[in-house]
Each structure stands twice: as structure tokens, then as C-alpha cells.
Amino acid sequence: MSTYDEVEIEDMTFDPDTQIFTYPCPCGDRFQISIDDMYDGEDIAVCPSCSLMIQVVFDKEDLVEYYVEANLEPPGKIAVAV
């Protein structure tokens, strides 16, 4: 699969309400990928308006801060009652 570009997660915009990362596409729309898809190993963000895709460069550990920003418990964490 051919991608338009590689983009670091830090260069993307995260919306904590929708839990979606976005990045400007040359067509005028925005590439999109959800934080849950990224946690599940997906690293390709797609543009809903054209056929372009980008590869998002990140480590799974990078996602924890974004889950916290969205007031969500990161997957894989076990809540412990005290």
C-alpha cells in the first residue's frame, strides 16, 4: 500500500471530544484516524474526500497522554478499587 506521506503523531491535531486525530490533506479536507484504531495497531490515516492516505508514526505509549486528555482510561489498564 502506498501512502502520501509519513507524519509524526505530534504533528497531528487531536480532538478529545471525537477522539480523532486529524492532519491537513492537500485536497483541502483532513486525514483522520481514531485513537482506538491506533491503539489496535492501525497506523494509516485516510482522507474522506480523496484517495490519499498517510502513515502515522507513533509508539503505543504515546497514546496514553491523549486518552488522559479525553478523560478516558487507556485500554489495557485495570482499575483497582481501594
UniProtKB/Swiss-Prot annotation:
Reaction equations catalysed: [3Fe-4S](1+)-[protein] + Fe(2+)-[Dph3] = [3Fe-4S](0)-[protein] + Fe(3+)-[Dph3]; 2 [3Fe-4S](0)-[protein] + 2 Fe(2+)-[Dph3] + NADH = 2 [4Fe-4S](1+)-[protein] + 2 [Dph3] + NAD(+) + H(+)
Subunit field text: Component of the 2-(3-amino-3-carboxypropyl)histidine synthase complex composed of DPH1, DPH2, DPH3 and a NADH-dependent reductase, predominantly CBR1.
Protein name, per record: Diphthamide biosynthesis protein 3
InterPro entries with a match to the protein in the record: DPH3/4-like (IPR044248), DPH_MB_dom (IPR007872), DPH_MB_sf (IPR036671)
Function: Required for the first step of diphthamide biosynthesis, a post-translational modification of histidine which occurs in elongation factor 2. DPH1 and DPH2 transfer a 3-amino-3-carboxypropyl (ACP) group from S-adenosyl-L-methionine (SAM) to a histidine residue, the reaction is assisted by a reduction system comprising KTI11/DPH3 and a NADH-dependent reductase, predominantly CBR1. Acts as an electron donor to reduce the Fe-S cluster in DPH1-DPH2 keeping the [4Fe-4S] clusters in the active and reduced state.
Gene Ontology terms, MF aspect: ferrous iron binding; iron chaperone activity; oxidoreductase activity
Phylogenetic lineage: Eukaryota, Fungi, Dikarya, Ascomycota, Saccharomycotina
Keywords for the protein's UniProt record, in alphabetical order: Cytoplasm, Iron, Metal-binding, Nucleus, Oxidoreductase
SUPFAM superfamilies listed in its UniProt record: CSL zinc finger (SSF144217)
Positions bound to Fe cation: C25, C27, C47, C50
Domain of life: Eukaryota
Subcellular location: Cytoplasm; Nucleus
Record-level GO BP terms: protein histidyl modification to diphthamide; tRNA wobble base 5-methoxycarbonylmethyl-2-thiouridinylation
Pathway assignment: Protein modification; peptidyl-diphthamide biosynthesis
Source organism per UniProt: Kluyveromyces lactis (strain ATCC 8585 / CBS 2359 / DSM 70799 / NBRC 1267 / NRRL Y-1140 / WM37)
Domain notes: The DPH-type metal-binding (MB) domain can also bind zinc. However, iron is the physiological binding partner as zinc binding impairs the protein electron donor function.
Domain spans labelled DPH-type MB: 3-59
Gene (name only): DPH3
One Gene Ontology term, aspect cellular component: nucleus
Cofactor(s) the record lists: Fe(2+)
